[in-house]
Amino acid sequence: EYYNGTTWIQPGVQSYSTVSGSFSAEVGKNYFCNTNGGGITATLPASPDLGATITFFDVAKTFDSNALTVSRNGKPIQGDSANLTVNTEGAAFSLVFSGDTYGWRIFSI
């Protein structure tokens, strides 16, 4: 267990959710995104802490026809001031917050 400056974190404890509509993503969660019914938007936290991590999975393998849009909520993604559109079938990736200059970075694919 460690303190990240805001909350106590327990390593190895992970939270999973299945989503099929637009949602506000929470730090430390893993999302199985089902876009069978149409594209969805995940809105990132507005004030994340350094090292905050969120993971997304294309559980239905439909991002190619119904994309996941990751709304940056004021912070850069990959250093860019644009939302991230993911349209690769079967995509799975994590975003980690690196600070206000470069914002959310793709940590793993």
Where are these regions (language model features)?
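Short edge-strand/loop segments of extracellular domains
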Residues: S71-D80
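Exposed extracellular interaction/assembly regions and N-terminal maturation sites
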Residues: T7-S71, D100-I109
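Extracellular disulfide-bonded cysteine-rich modules/repeats
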Residues: E1-Y3, T88-G99
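Beta-strand-rich interaction surfaces with strong enrichment in secreted/lumenal proteins
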Residues: S81-V86
